[in-house]
Amino acid sequence: LRYKTWESYFYPETYNPATGQGTLRNLYGERDAKALARMEYGDTSARAYDLVHGQVRLPRTYDAAHIRAIHGYLFQDVYEWAGQYRGVNISKNVSTFADVHAGQVDRYLNDVHRLVTGTEWASLDHEEFSRASAEVFAYLNQAHPFREGNGRTSKVFMEHVAELSRFTLDFSRVSPEVWNQASMLSGPDLGRYEPVPDSLVPVFRVIAQPRATGPSNRSTGMGRSAVRASYPQVTTEVTRRSSGATQQRPSRRPCRGQGSRGVER
């Protein structure tokens, strides 16, 4: 694995040890972080459009391979590690995600697969769909499998899940601030493994909209809102090195993080 350390993801000449920030190594060879963000936005938006409109068909296995395939397709123009698990542990604000070294990423993604395949999505009403979707997303968000692009990958995956139901997902109906806050609050409590999806249920109530044609096993082109909502701006995720201790957050209360390292979008 080439990317074993935090610093290895960055061009050395752009990396600032004091902040843990720099420009991620990329297939463009671009050293300017802002320019990279613009280029990434353009290419991944076009790829996302292909996925949500069914122009590219990925096997709907709802497992780790499915999630990696989405990420690999979205970021194939940008990073050589597209579709590959991150090699470092990361956190965002007060949220610390799955410990990749302890095998937690696969464990959480196995739970995602279990939840999706064990649910009769076509029979769910709006409230049931909102609760089931919130639980699936909470586990997927806690996995946070990739160094970059977890949010975009997760939204496409959730749209693939919604294809099984009588609903579509319109992410533009909630602000990025509401989405990010609900996602943060869904993380496990101290010393616990299980995410707490309660904060996400009202969000999915809002973004879940009736599907005109009912459940589908095909991508039906859920509209442009998902592409727009997935990329309203370049999002940043503050990350830090793992301490080697528990990978759950201290609590679900907002607080000031310490030891912030780097930026993940």
Briefly describe each language-model feature range:
Residues L1-R265:
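FIC/Doc superfamily catalytic core
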